[in-house]
Amino acid sequence: MRFLPCIATLAATASALAIGDHVRSDDQYVLELAPGQTKVVTEAEKWALRAEGKRFFDITERASSLELASNKKQKLAVTYPDSVQHNETVQNLIKSLDKKNFETVLQPFSEFHNRYYKSDNGKKSSEWLQGKIQEIISASGAKGVTVEPFKHSFPQSSLIAKIPGKSDKTIVLGAHQDSINLDSPSEGRAPGADDDGSGVVTILEAFRVLLTDEKVAAGEAPNTVEFHFYAGEEGGLLGSQDIFEQYSQKSRDVKAMLQQDMTGYTKGTTDAGKPESIGIITDNVDENLTKFLKVIVDAYCTIPTVDSKCGYGCSDHASATKYGYPAAFAFESAFGDDSPYIHSADDTIETVNFDHVLQHGRLTLGFAYELAFADSL
């Protein structure tokens, strides 16, 4: 993932034809570059845009619709707590976060040649990750907790791990599992250690620790919690679009979604003489949920936040936003200080600062627990 503000310039020159007017041949893709602004490109042109740092929704499979998802009716705003309510419990849970687990999972996960969503590697890496999630569930002894693949039109499946609560009100924690080498998308080496292996291990470890809480494991939390591992993010938020479109169609009651995309690179920040921080994205997010996210960081992390912007369609939280669900996004730094190695063979585990990943794990765990037990959402 890399997001640049110049997408606005591109969007201004893009065709604003209604989606229903597009006719797609086998090698053409419909991209949404900004709300209501679309462009038809070849696959080569699509990846060229990504290599330039442009971000977009690939809405090719939604091109028969006369209405963009971004124009759908927005859901009612959610009111979040203005302070943490479960500090003692969460602080005790935080002690169980194990930094070694990040590396134990990330090492083999980044050893797949790539995790390209259209490839056999993408399929196998998703199956491998599903196995790891199932191991955590089995070891926890929690009843009713599941992990299921969410199938798409491409080989890689998204994964949804669900911890049922007393209601269908749902809290979503997300990260994307695919990786890409933009010099050779289908065949190039793409370890994807930071982008977004770091986000995957962040929410996976939070999932493990959350299940050690007796009330959570017994299904006694007021709200349901889901952990999403999205496929096809690099191709235009493909997996998360499919999921949140379905959730919208089924009137799923998602009260909050937090995305973790790149949580491990700090050298850009420290080399610039800035304090290590958690980046809080402020565009294309829910303002109230973002304020609550800062409350969580203040309470449960030991480093500060820094506000930043990432542009349109920069990660999977944008899919939640598009379908009317409140979403927030925590990032490894301010935009511009993030890893320069992503989308290449150099995005390796050696570039990941696991102490920083641990900070994101703390905020993920706090966010999940506080909202799981928020009975006024």
From Swiss-Prot:
Q: Where in the cell is it found?
A: Secreted
Enzymatic class: hydrolase
Query: Record's superkingdom?
Result: Eukaryota
Temperature dependence per UniProt: Optimum temperature is 60 degrees Celsius.
Cofactor(s) required, per the database record: Zn(2+)
Instruction: Provide the family line.
Output: Belongs to the peptidase M28 family. M28E subfamily.
Name of the protein: Leucine aminopeptidase A
Q: What is the primary gene name for this protein?
A: lapA
